């Protein structure tokens, strides 16, 4: 039965459900999720630009979604949410309810009948390519054009071409794209840089923010705000025109991240904003939903079960907020620095996010100056100065490095991570503290094959011994900004060595590396190691230009 907007009414999603293969999942948890994900079905938040958020697969398919993900019809939970329905969701649900209790019913056969499974493009490069030639060959293979999308698909169409990371990541990702752009620009593909900037501006205008990725199930959160740095990158080629062209979306993105700041009392939080007891305003990662992530449904249900003393919705929100951080998952977000079930992302003020917000404020001030809106220039210059003061007060560890702050516990966290170099990357750190941070980073994180993500081995992918291309670039640039060219070169050459060793052995680039010098791909995480790989390609090209010894 449909309501006037053509959406299935939530009351029809509440009959008895058979949970295939749920012996390891408490029925109470599954029922709670079903109520949370389905009874909110018709609620589409107004994004302020005349468009409602399209529904994600968990809301479109309700009990069928729960059954498919719980039964693990596909090994990867992301597969089902990326499928394309062959009929209207209401028709599919009606068929499911009619057939599910019939003897001999096969859920897998039903899904095969009604959904088209996404396929991963097999990339077979020519033999004997150099590393540089291989990356340049990959750009067209990783480029997608989806100006339209099938009805009720989770894919959000974008007006212009874009580059995907590769593997299971069949869509564009927000913060990945900055590092991909570094390589595209080095390859002379400024056309793609401009296209992706325009796509992000389109999403800001449509949704009010840049989603995690162009999928409906990513719309409830963003990712680290690199849009300002993308504009800065474009400005290196086209000059000041880039600032005026993207000034309006930059200001809209800032408004998104600062929602609720004016009306939040000291000691309270609202969305991505936290107001500390002294009135200082800083940002945190957040997600507007508090249910299991559709693309990782079963894992999130299991994690909440491992924290029986916490409301499941609280755990799920913190898992989602960690996904917004891009560091999913890491000891940075764990209460005990070791266990996923202790995750408390929304209680933490991250040093990287607040450095990026400083950059956003600076870029808006610069754009306003170019546009000769000097009142705006003063306003955002003041925002940036206040944030710099706040970062120095709250996000500095007495041991001599920048760190995250737990605003609920009222103390800086001890975890030293590669995120410590972000204030240096955006050039907001005083020289003395910058030098201290670089010394600590070099001593604790620099390995034979590059910079380790953290000092802790937790089996999570954003911890030791993994190293990630974007964090190498951030630390390298941070070192250069503060006069440490030799350290920058050491980081760059060591990580490039990791990439070269694996490429020599397997003829591919991957999303993360073990930086112990073995030349192997990184481990941990919720899925197998992916190759492609957008941001590794981008950073590697820049490293080849700087330290590639003629390659």
From Swiss-Prot:
Chief location of this protein within or outside the cell: periplasm
Q: What class of enzyme is it?
A: hydrolase
Database matches in Pfam families:
Trehalase
The record's subcellular location field reads:
Periplasm
Q: Name the residues that bind substrate.
A: 168, 175-176, 212, 221-223, 293-295, 326, 526
One MF term in GO for this entry?
alpha,alpha-trehalase activity
For this chain's UniProt record, which GO biological process terms are given? cellular hyperosmotic response; trehalose catabolic process
Q: What is its EC number?
A: 3.2.1.28
Q: Name one GO cellular component term.
A: periplasmic space
Cite the entry's keywords alphabetically: Glycosidase, Hydrolase, Periplasm, Plasmid, Signal
Q: Which residues form the signal peptide?
A: 1-45
Which residues are the active-site ones?
328, 511
Q: Which SUPFAM superfamilies match?
A: Six-hairpin glycosidases
**According to its UniProt entry, what is the function of this protein?**
Provides the cells with the ability to utilize trehalose at high osmolarity by splitting it into glucose molecules that can subsequently be taken up by the phosphotransferase-mediated uptake system.
Q: What is this protein called?
A: Periplasmic trehalase
Say which species the protein is native to: Ralstonia nicotianae (strain ATCC BAA-1114 / GMI1000) (Ralstonia solanacearum)
């Amino acid at each position: 039965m449909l309501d006037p907007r053509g959406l299935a009414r939530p009351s029809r999603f509440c009959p008895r459900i058979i949970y295939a293969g749920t012996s390891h999942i408490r029925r109470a948890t599954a029922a709670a999720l079903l109520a949370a994900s389905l009874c909110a079905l018709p609620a589409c938040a107004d994004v302020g630009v005349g468009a409602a958020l399209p529904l994600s697969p968990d809301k479109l398919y309700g009990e069928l979604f729960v059954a498919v993900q719980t039964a693990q019809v596909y090994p990867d939970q992301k597969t089902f949410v990326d499928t394309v329905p062959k009929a209207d969701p209401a028709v599919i649900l009606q068929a499911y309810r009619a057939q599910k209790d019939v003897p001999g019913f096969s859920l897998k056969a039903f899904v095969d009948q009604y959904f088209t499974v996404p396929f991963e493009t097999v990339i077979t490069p020519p033999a004997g390519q150099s590393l540089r030639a291989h990356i340049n060959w990959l750009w067209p293979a990783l480029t997608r054009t989806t100006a339209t999308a099938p009805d009720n698909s989770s894919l959000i169409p974008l007006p212009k071409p874009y580059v995907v990371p590769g593997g299971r990541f069949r869509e564009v990702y927000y913060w990945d794209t900055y590092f991909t752009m570094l390589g595209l620009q080095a390859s002379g593909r400024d056309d793609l840089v401009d296209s992706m900037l325009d796509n992000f501006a389109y999403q800001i205008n449509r949704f009010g923010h840049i989603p995690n990725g162009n999928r409906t199930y990513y719309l409830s959160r963003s990712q680290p705000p690199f849009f300002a740095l993308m504009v800065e990158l474009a400005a290196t080629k086209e000059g000041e025109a880039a600032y005026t062209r993207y000034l309006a979306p930059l200001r809209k993105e800032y408004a998104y991240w600062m929602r609720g700041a004016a009306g939040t009392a000291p000691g309270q939080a609202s969305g991505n904003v936290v107001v500390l007891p002294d009135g200082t305003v800083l940002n945190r990662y957040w997600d507007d939903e508090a249910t299991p992530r559709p693309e990782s449904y079963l894992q999130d249900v299991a994690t909440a079960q491992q924290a029986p003393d916490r409301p499941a919705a609280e755990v799920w929100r913190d898992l989602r907020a960690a996904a917004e951080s891009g560091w999913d998952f890491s000891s940075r977000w764990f209460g005990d620095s070791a266990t996923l079930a202790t995750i408390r992302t929304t209680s933490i003020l991250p040093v990287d996010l607040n450095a990026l917000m400083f950059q956003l404020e600076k870029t808006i001030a610069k754009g306003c100056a170019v546009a000769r809106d000097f009142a705006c220039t003063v306003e955002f210059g003041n925002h940036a100065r206040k944030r710099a003061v706040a970062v120095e007060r709250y996000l500095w560890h007495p041991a001599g490095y920048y760190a995250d702050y737990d605003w609920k516990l009222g103390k800086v966290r001890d975890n030293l991570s590669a995120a410590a170099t972000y204030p240096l990357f955006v050039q907001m750190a005083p020289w003395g503290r910058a030098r201290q941070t670089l010394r600590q980073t070099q001593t604790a994180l620099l390995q034979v094959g590059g910079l380790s993500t953290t000092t802790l081995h937790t089996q999570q992918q954003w911890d030791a011994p993994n190293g990630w291309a974007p964090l190498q670039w951030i630390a390298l640039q941070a070192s250069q900004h503060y006069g440490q060219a030799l350290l920058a070169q050491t980081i760059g050459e060591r990580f490039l060595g990791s990439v070269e060793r694996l490429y020599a052995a397997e003829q591919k680039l991957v999303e993360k590396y073990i930086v112990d010098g073995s030349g192997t791909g990184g481990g941990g995480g919720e899925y197998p190691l992916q190759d492609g790989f957008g941001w590794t390609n981008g950073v590697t090209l820049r490293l080849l230009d700087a330290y590639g010894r003629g390659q």
